[in-house]
Swiss-Prot record:
HAMP domain segment(s): 175-228
TM ranges: 14-34, 148-172
EC number: 2.7.13.3
Known role: Probable member of a two-component regulatory system. It is not known what protein it phosphorylates and in which regulatory pathway it acts, as the narL and other nar genes do not exist in H.influenzae.
Protein's organism: Haemophilus influenzae (strain ATCC 51907 / DSM 11121 / KW20 / Rd)
InterPro entries referenced in this protein's UniProt entry, alphabetically: HAMP_dom, HATPase_C_sf, His_kinase_dom, NarX-like_N, NarX-like_N_sf, Sensor_HK_TwoCompSys, Sig_transdc_His_kin_NarX/NarQ, Sig_transdc_His_kin_sub3_dim/P
Keywords of this entry: ATP-binding, Cell inner membrane, Cell membrane, Kinase, Membrane, Nucleotide-binding, Phosphoprotein, Transferase, Transmembrane, Transmembrane helix, Two-component regulatory system
Name this protein carries in UniProt: Sensor protein NarQ homolog
Length: 567
């Protein structure tokens, strides 16, 4: 992406300029160095011109025949390519060129004297000619030195220029790239630490770093706004969760108070007071129908505020009214609705519980009345008959009447003792059913209460479910078991009594009382004894079957067979 004032473009331009300068300087240095290639040869050749000119003078005097050969050599040296190359260089100084032309002109005259073997004129001009050659050699050496100095100067200037340009590029890069990136790094670390108001970045620059700074600043600003919104949302959710938790806690505490205690005006007052405080209510009132003494009011009603009302009802049965006025902060309407439902259910269950208690009380009274009628009423009827006979015999004074009277009194005492014993057993059974409704434990309690009356071993084995019988059925079963066990203790003359409760092959409940004694002779009861009849009557009320018979291995078995479904 092109950006006005691009840092990368400017750095690229600077580097390109440095490359161009380095290329130019390198080319110039190479040109200077290449121009020095013939300088040494030219200096050597020009220096040899002096020796050759003296040699020609000697040969003119001593060996005239070799002068022509040396002249050709001299001509070759004087017009050598090294000297011509130096003369043809575009930056050769004019002094050097004039000096070379002067040597050429003088050598024209000198060559003429040499060819004419004119030793006198040749030697006369030789001194000046050698002086000109020496001057040419001097100028040639100075020109070579100047070129080396120029080359070194150019290289030095180039190095200095490149160094300055590189320094500028470094300074520019540090100012335009490194420092902004360093600031941006600090800013990013601050953003990472949730400090969205980071150090200011230079967003005015129209380059890549300026664009990046603007984008980063905008991003951090948006992140800060987003974080603030998220923080507000989290705080709002946290507040709602706290409110929900407080609501659930309030409902839980209210439910605990209503479910774990017998509801009354004190419990209702505790629940309403808890709601009144926790939900910042200004006014709350509950009215219970049929129990006006339970009406509770907390706070003061404000006539200017709306009164909210919830009817306490279950299955369209209206039980009361809950009304309230909210304070600040306003409570969740659902908590008051749930509270109204809990209060309605609690009042409904309390009402049903009271009704069930009344029914149970009436049923218990009915059971007691029936038991008293089945046991004691027959004894009292027998006593009344005996008392009538006794009164009749007392009117007679003969000896036989007295004996009958004594027999009646004995029967009277026996019946009275038996009735008293039945009353104690009946009371023990009622206490047992009240204290323990579990069949197995109730059987054990009955048998344990009889252990003091005998030395026989008595074992209980109950395989029926613990809640197989309701309280009324349990009373009948326990009375039958007590009566059968008492008969075995009194009449069996055995050593072991087995009491078992199980489910037979047909799926019926069976309760067995077995002993290993002499066995029952028959099912006829003596006069004044009604135990077997009472057992049979109880079985009829249970819709059960009673079987009493002698066992083949000895002893008596009393078996009660009950249908599987009793309720």
């Amino acid at each position: 992406m092109y950006t006005k004032g691009s840092v990368s473009t400017r750095i690229a331009k600077y580097l390109f300029i440095i490359l161009i300068v380095a290329g130019v300087i390198s080319s110039l240095s190479l040109a200077i160095m290449s121009s020095n290639k013939y300088d040494a040869e030219a200096i050597n050749i020009s220096g040899s011109l002096r020796m050759q000119s003296y040699r020609l003078l000697y040969e003119m005097q001593e060996q005239p025949e070799s002068v022509e050969t040396n002249l050709r050599r001299y001509h070759i040296s004087l017009h050598s390519s090294a000297l011509l190359e130096v003369q043809n260089q575009f930056f050769t100084p004019n002094v050097l060129k004039h000096s070379y032309q002067n040597i050429l002109q003088r050598w024209t005259n000198m060559e003429k004297y040499a060819r004419q073997q004119d030793v006198k004129n040749y030697s006369k001009q030789l001194t000046d000619y050698v002086a000109d050659v020496d001057y040419f050699v001097f100028e040639l050496q100075r020109f070579s030195e100047q070129k080396w100095i120029l080359g070194v100067s150019v290289l030095g200037f180039a190095m200095l220029l490149i160094l300055l340009m590189v320094s500028y590029v470094i300074w520019y890069t540090n100012r335009e790239v490194v420092k902004p990136l360093h600031l941006m790094t600090k800013a990013s670390m601050q953003v990472q630490m949730r400090q969205f108001n980071h150090i200011p970045l230079d967003t005015r620059k129209q380059n890549e770093l300026g664009t990046l700074a603007r984008v980063f600043t905008q991003m951090s600003t948006e992140l800060g706004q987003l974080y603030s919104r998220l923080e507000e949302a989290v705080n709002e959710k946290t507040q709602k969760l706290r409110q929900t938790n407080r609501t659930l806690s309030t409902l839980y505490q209210s439910a605990q108070l209503l479910n774990t205690n017998t509801i009354n005006d004190k419990i209702l007052n505790q629940v309403l007071n808890y709601i009144f405080i926790s939900d910042h209510l200004n006014f709350v009132k509950v009215e219970v129908m049929g129990a006006e003494h339970w009406d509770i009011t907390l706070g003061k009603q404000d006539a200017n505020n709306e009164l909210q009302i919830e009817t306490l009802s279950v299955d369209n049965e209206e039980l009361g009214v809950l009304s309230w006025q909210a304070g600040l902060p306003c409570p969740d309407p659902r908590i008051m609705q749930n509270l109204a439902q809990m209060l309605a259910r609690a009042l409904y269950f309390h009402k049903n519980l009271r009704q069930k208690e009344q029914l149970l009380l009436m049923e218990e009274r009915s059971i007691i009345a029936r038991e008293l009628h089945d046991s004691l009423a027959q004894v009292l009827s027998f006593l009344q008959i005996q008392l009538t006979l006794l009164k009749h015999n007392l009117k007679k004074e003969d000896e036989q009447s007295k004996e009958k009277s004594l027999a009646i009194i004995a029967n009277f005492e026996q019946a009275l003792s038996g009735g008293y014993a039945q009353l104690r057993e009946l009371l023990a059974t009622f206490r047992l059913t009240i204290q323990e409704a579990n069949l197995q434990l109730a059987l054990k309690q009955v048998i344990d209460s009889l252990r003091s009356q005998t030395t026989m071993q008595m074992n209980v084995n109950c395989q029926l479910p613990s809640q197989s019988l309701n309280p009324q059925q349990l009373v009948h079963v326990l009375q039958i078991v007590r009566e059968a066990t008492t008969n075995a203790i009194k009449h069996s003359q055995g050593t072991v009594i087995e009491i078992s409760a199980r489910i037979n092959a047909e799926g019926e409940y069976e309760i067995l009382v077995e002993d290993d004694g002499v066995g029952i002779p028959n099912l006829e009861e003596p006069e004044g004894h009604y135990g077997l009849n009472i057992m049979a009557e109880r079985c009829r009320q249970l819709n059960a079957q009673l079987h009493i018979h002698r066992r083949e291995q000895g002893g008596t078995q009393v078996k009660i067979t009950l249908p599987h479904t009793l309720y």
